[in-house]
Structures are given as C-alpha cells and as structure tokens.
Amino acid sequence: KSCCPTTAARNQYNICRLPGTPRPVCAALSGCKIISGTGCPPGYRH
C-alpha cells in the first residue's frame, strides 16, 4: 500500500506507476511511502 502526503503527490505517484515503474522508485520520486499494513501514518493520508 502506498501513502502520500498530498493529493498532488498521489497523482504524481500514480502517473509514475503507469508504465510499470517499481513502487519504491515512484514513492521516492513523489514523496510517498510504501507501507505493509493498511493504515497510513499521520501526514500521509492520500
């Protein structure tokens, strides 16, 4: 699961993922986090 700090970051992450870019790469580029659970940490609700 990915968690992003803003809607803009979420959009950037999603666009990054479209061609099949690995999740960790897109998370690093967009400022999002990849978590193993179901709940995002505070400040990463998008």
From Swiss-Prot:
InterPro entries: Thionin, Thionin-like_sf. It holds the Pfam family Thionin. GO terms for biological process: defense response. It comes from Dendrophthora clavata. The keyword Metal-binding does not apply. This is Denclatoxin-B. Belongs to the plant thionin (TC 1.C.44) family. It is found in: Secreted. Thionins are small plant proteins which are toxic to animal cells. They seem to exert their toxic effect at the level of the cell membrane. Their precise function is not known. The keyword ATP-binding does not apply. Disulfide bonds join C3-C40, C4-C32, C16-C26.
